[in-house]
Amino acid sequence: MKYYISFAWRNIWRNKKRSILATSSIFFAVFLALIMRSLQFGQYEYMVNSTVSMYTGYLQLQAKGFWDNHSFDESFELTDTLYRKMKNHAGITTINPRIETAALISHATETRISPVIGIDPYSEDKMTGLKKRLSKGNYLTEESKGILIAEGLADRLNVDVGDSIVIFGQGYQGVIAAQVFQIEGIIKYPIPKMNNAFVYMTIKNAQELFNLSNRITSIPIMINNPSKLYELRNELSSKIDTNLVIMTWEEMSPEIVQAIAVDNASGFIMLLILYIVIGFGVFGTIVMMTLERT
């Protein structure tokens, strides 16, 4: 055995330049592959974290049919039992009850259609960091009677902090919802699409406006171990009413999943090409070493 090791060692260094070149090629390929894949997976993790923390949550509790219809007819009652069951689960870090709809936002002669979100100010800030996006005015409290409005939407409506707007939409069971709200704060999103939309108010005000009593439309959920996403989803699904459903972020954001899959496939192809090129180089070295011995 020692003879073979000694023979192999002498054979490697028989042509130092060629051996160093082959070793360097392999090292370069592995190093480049590690860097490239690390950057890719880091980007994927950032995309997922941004998506779930900015809006959807890792999981989201809804009534069946709400995701497809976004109607108050598919809202559900937030009971104390349901709230405690979610709040006290060891695998859940944050639950964020919401009321989500779209309505007409009007000021003077300007009118826009915008998402209107009823939130718990503390839970929303804990999950999405909404308070740090405040550019003017004050953040909402549980006692607030006003609203927060996205900066781009405020510019389109030509409004500022202290101005009043009218929100007009359809409430629960077809009730007409219309009310005047004062702007308490303006928020700024880095994403233009989000910065040109979104109006936030407290859940209490949204329930009064849309005649929802104690009903909500969704509960985004943040968890402490994303690797157990489906395990936790299945566990929670077995403990909730059959009229409710828990969706994963992948189901709510299929475009992110598709983008990651395409980018991952392209990265794998690039690695394959790299390994083939390096493989031919190593194969050439082996052939030359063999020919020298014949």
Regions found by a protein language model. Give the residues of each.
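Solvent-exposed, non-transmembrane alpha-helical starts
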Residues: H70-E77, S106-A108, I113, E124-G129, ...
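Small-residue-enriched segments and motifs
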Residues: A90-T93, S114, F181-G185, L244, ...
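Hydrophobic secondary-structure segments that place a key small or acidic residue at a functional site
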Residues: I99, R112-I119, R133-K204
